[in-house]
Swiss-Prot record:
Lineage, broadest ranks: Bacteria, Pseudomonadati, Pseudomonadota, Gammaproteobacteria, Alteromonadales
Source organism (scientific name): Shewanella sediminis (strain HAW-EB3)
Protein name per UniProt: Large ribosomal subunit protein bL33
GO biological processes: translation
PROSITE patterns: RIBOSOMAL_L33
NCBIfam families associated with the record: PRK00595.1, rpmG_bact
Gene name tied to this protein: rpmG
Keyword Ribonucleoprotein: yes
InterPro entries (alphabetical): Ribosomal_bL33, Ribosomal_bL33_CS, Ribosomal_bL33_sf, Ribosomal_zn-bd
SUPFAM superfamilies in the record: Zn-binding ribosomal proteins
The keyword Transmembrane appears for this protein: no
GO cellular component terms listed in the entry, alphabetical order: cytosolic large ribosomal subunit
GO terms assigned for molecular function: structural constituent of ribosome
């Protein structure tokens, strides 16, 4: 039998600088039910900005 993937869900991290840049990652919904916010590098404006979680369509 194949092993289940579990509670990990793919998410998109969208730049708060409104550049349209985003990262994709996975997170465990059981351990982290709140929306993820993380500071990452935005190569469009070449600065570190806050990235906020959005659903992948």
């Amino acid at each position: 039998m194949a092993k289940s993937k579990g509670n990990r869900e793919k998410i998109k991290l969208v730049s708060s600088a409104k550049t349209g840049h985003f990262y994709t990652t996975e997170k465990n919904k059981r351990n982290m039910p709140e929306k993820m916010e993380i500071k990452k590098f935005d190569p469009v404006i070449r600065q570190h900005v806050m990235y906020k979680e959005a659903k992948i369509k």
